[in-house]
Amino acid sequence: MPGLSDPVAFIKDFAAGGISAAISKTAVAPIERVKLLLQVQHISKQIAEADRYKGMVDCFVRIPREQGFSAFWRGNLANVIRYFPTQALNFAFKDKYKQVFLGGVDKNTQFTRYFIGNLASGGMAGATSLCFVYPLDFARTRLAADVGKGAEAREFKGLGDCISKIFKTDGLVGLYRGFGVSVQGIIIYRAAYFGFYDTARGMLPNPKTTPWYVSWAIAQCVTTVAGIVSYPFDTVRRRMMMQSGRAKSEIVYKGTLHCWATIAKQEGTGAFFKGAFSNVLRGTGGAFVLVLYDEIKKVL
């Protein structure tokens, strides 16, 4: 584990996390866009009720037919730009927080403290990085939710256009809409994502010699469980993001709590999990990130 005074080790952590994240996110971009559309279509001004996607398969079929095959990667560049610092900071700060929460803790004799320390370090790492990259996360969501068929029908021309338009209409608040519930969700997700993964690997006889497929299986289980548990928070935050830039008369949700209540009342609790199966499939990429990160660190 790199020390706090070891900048080389910190940079290696940053590079390994960022590179592995960029590769995996590009690979699963089509799945992520489908997931986002299923989550926010009920609040989208571009998708009429009669034109809403019926499910994951319907969405996969209609996107290339209506928007072109390359539309599967709409917003992917913004996602890579966002995800590189997000994941890199998550991994880098995770080890820093582990030194704070796990310093001097023996995993064999202090398992409870070891487990809680891993949960805390993972959650704090996710929350810290989110503070820095939230506007990029916001823009990625809005670009992916843009279903305009041509340049003129698109709501935003690109990442810069999205950020500038929202900033002009709503200011910085618009770019950080949904931040509160995002922090709640990210702490829950990252706590499980890093906490359970590191705890499981820590219980192995020799993590450094563990076969890659064992690490992948552990990571797959972790990302699936973490994704499902935190999914409702993700749905609410993305619904809130969709309201930025709108006129007051077009605002549907008065706040985060009102959003939770409105979705549950009008659409049912199942609405919080729309696109969740796509998220499970996307989790394969998340599991790949964890394994690839460990492998890249061995090379660096």
Swiss-Prot record:
Protein name (Swiss-Prot/TrEMBL): ADP,ATP carrier protein 2
Each Solcar repeat, start to end: 8-100, 113-203, 214-299
InterPro entries registered for this protein in UniProt: ADT_euk_type, Mit_carrier, Mitochondrial_sb/sol_carrier, Mt_carrier_dom_sf
Residues passing through the membrane, by range: 10-39, 77-101, 112-132, 181-201, 213-233, 276-293
Native species: Anopheles gambiae (African malaria mosquito)
Residues annotated as binding ADP: 82, 94, 237
Signal sequence extent: none
GO MF annotation, one: ATP:ADP antiporter activity
